[in-house]
Design a protein with these regions (language model features):
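Extracytoplasmic cell-surface/polysaccharide-interacting catalytic and binding patches
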Residues: 1-190
Length: 190
């Protein structure tokens, strides 16, 4: 079963295993528009599956969109600096990965935003509004091959604070396996 589950989407990037562009050379990336109107890149299959998830959420009366997908090293550095200025270094270290250790370098990770009253809700500033809505989305992640990358009960393993908006595409089979065995990708990959 292990060999079957080790698909190309099982590659992990974190503080222990830095991003290596060679691992992702066979992936196809496409341009999309983020919730704040920026042109961003995302891995093609990840985007296809996210659009299916998005349609599922519309049936639930929930509008979701992509705030961030692929971030290059400069964008990651800029985001880290912004978080340090806005929230302080201690908080930034818990929620924004250093350059080279972010799954956003892969294009397989997505920061999801929800729309409330025709406005996209910024997760860090309005977690009390977005989290209950995102928890509805969590129930459908596996069906479309996604996992909640940084769950609350696994912070000591992921070394990242709980992020209800951060999902990661791994494929449906691996998503099911991780869920059934109560594992995060870090536990599976090592």
């Amino acid at each position: 079963m292990e060999e079957k589950l080790n698909n190309k989407y099982s590659i992990i990037v974190n503080k222990k295993r830095r991003y290596n562009a060679d691992d992702f050379k066979d992936f196809k990336y496409i341009n999309i528009t983020s919730t704040d109107g920026r042109n961003i890149l995302i891995e093609e299959v990840t985007n296809i599956q996210f659009n299916k998830l998005k349609e599922e959420m519309k049936k639930q009366g929930i509008n979701i969109g992509i705030k961030y997908a692929l971030r290059n090293e400069q964008e990651q550095s800029d985001l880290y600096k912004k978080f340090c200025e806005k929230y302080g270094k201690e908080y930034a270290d818990k929620i924004v990965c250093p350059v080279g250790t972010s799954e956003h370098h892969t294009g397989l990770a997505i920061d999801v935003e929800v729309m409330v009253d025709n406005k996209w809700i910024i997760n860090n500033d309005n977690i009390e509004i977005s989290e209950p809505i995102l928890k509805v989305m969590h129930r459908y992640l596996i069906k479309y091959g996604f996992i909640l990358r940084y769950p609350k009960q696994k912070e000591n393993i992921t070394q990242i604070t709980y992020e209800p908006w951060h999902i990661r595409y791994v494929g449906t089979e691996l998503a099911n396996y991780l869920n059934q065995n109560n594992l995060v990708l870090d536990e599976y990959s090592y």
